[in-house]
From Swiss-Prot:
SMART domains referenced in this protein's UniProt entry, alphabetically: PP2C_SIG, PP2Cc
Sites where the protein binds Mn(2+) 2: 36, 195, 234
Organism of this sequence: Bacillus subtilis (strain 168)
Residues that coordinate or bind Mn(2+) 1: 36-37
GO molecular function list: metal ion binding; protein serine/threonine phosphatase activity
Lineage of producing organism: Bacteria, Bacillati, Bacillota, Bacilli, Bacillales
Identification of the protein by name: Protein phosphatase PrpC
């Protein structure tokens, strides 16, 4: 598995409230995480970093990682619920952090399958051959309006409340988590990203960049550059996982 990560403050914001991590384990298992924080002062930065750090710690502390998709989803849910409580309790104990929260999207790769869990509007995309699909469903007010047929997807792109979330990590004591698992084959690519990328780079451009012959790190660099070229009003984060077709001699799979 080839991996790459890039997070950037963007051209307008003073602080980067996004965070991300790629954690490797035994048997080439990989956990990738993207979090997009929110809250007053620097609280969003606190929430996203807490989420990524805690997921990484739980990954490193795990004696065994399940391989069955249903068990992988269960493991992700348990860890994210624990992180939710940790962020919520921290916010309640620190006045300057009250109301903080974060999105989270995680992908757990276990060889031939990937399990994805998410809260909020940070996304996971899958590229298989020429099929480029959004794996996650945004937990946002605008997406709910689209889902119920009140507005079109085209209207959603320019809706004034586009960034209003219907749920986030750490804002409530209890939260529901969406999960999904699927098979992955050599050549497939998985993109995890914050809305600072998807609000500025069209799906066709995302697909074209992922399909290019560039190295994974060059691809995520280009994705972030594109978002900045198109305004860069928000923090931008992209994590790329590529299941290599073959291992080139001397090439680093990590």
């Amino acid at each position: 598995m080839l991996t790459a990560l890039k997070t950037d403050t963007g051209k307008i914001r003073q602080h980067n409230e996004d965070d991300a991590g790629i954690f490797k384990g035994k048997d080439e298992f990989i956990l990738a995480v993207v979090a997009d924080g929110m809250g007053g002062h620097l609280a969003g930065d606190v929430a996203s970093k807490m989420a990524v750090k805690a997921m990484g710690e739980k990954w490193n502390e795990a004696e065994t990682i399940p391989t069955a998709p249903s068990e992988c989803e269960k493991w992700l849910i348990e860890q994210i619920l624990s992180v939710n409580s940790k962020i919520y309790d921290h916010a309640q104990a620190h006045e300057e952090c009250q109301g903080m929260g974060t999105t989270i999207v995680c992908a757990l790769f276990t060889g031939k399958t990937v399990s994805v869990a998410h809260i909020g509007d940070s996304r996971c995309y899958l590229l298989q051959d020429d099929d480029f699909v959004q794996v996650t469903e945004d937990h946002s007010l605008v997406n709910e309006l689209v889902r119920t047929g009140e507005i079109s997807r085209e209207d959603a792109e320019h809706h004034p409340r586009k960034n209003v979330l219907t749920k986030a990590l750490g804002t409530d004591q209890l939260v529901s988590i969406d999960t999904r698992s699927f098979d992955i084959e050599p050549g497939d690519k998985l993109l995890l990203c914050s809305d600072g990328l998807t609000n500025k780079v069209e799906g066709t451009e995302l697909k074209d960049i992922l399909q290019s012959d560039s190295a994974p790190q060059e691809k995520v660099n280009l994705l972030v550059d594109k978002a900045n070229q198109n305004g860069g009003e928000d923090n931008i984060t992209a994590v790329l996982l590529e299941l290599a077709l073959q291992v080139e001699e001397g090439e680093d799979q990590c």
